[in-house]
Amino acid sequence: MAITLQALSEAHIPTILEACADWPELAQYGPPYWRPRSSAELRRKIADTAGPQPARAYSFVLADSDGRLVGETSIHAIDWRSRVAQVGICIWRPSDRGQGYGAAGSRTVIDWAVGHLGLHRLEAWILAGNSASLGLFRNLGFVEEGRLTQRYLVGSQYMDMLVLARITGA
């Protein structure tokens, strides 16, 4: 699966807003701090990535072999002293999920985080019911380390958040 990471930029905003139009469908898989996509929120992410270095977060879009944007990934909540960060991945459209984009994008951003940033530990916080993401990160060598009971409200139901981690050796 060929996937390219591109630093999030102003040119990507219209495509992202269109792809993320069904926010309730997307948000059910996301972390507690997710907000509906807006131009302002995306510009903040661009500024975080392009701002003073080293940044506390880096955001990328995923492009398939034809250049079509299919999702986003990030290295965020970076603790530079301990060289620890969280990794996130989102494939926007249901029709693009299960095609290998998430695995290819995650491998690429993890390799970049270890090789370029020198991060020692990566974490993935995933809803307990998100079996696709749990399987993806377990296949990438992440191990479940904890459960945050009733951490995230989905609709009217509280869900557990699982914390998975991988020691990179960097």
Labelled PLM ranges:
Residues 47-61:
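A short helix-loop-beta-strand connector motif used in the catalytic cores of GNAT acetyltransferases and
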Residues 25-47:
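Conserved GNAT-fold acetyl-CoA-binding loop/helix
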Residues 22-25, 51:
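Short helix-loop boundary/capping segments at the starts of domains
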Residues 1-15, 21-23, 59, 63-170:
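Acyl-donor (CoA/ACP) binding surface of acyl/acetyltransferases
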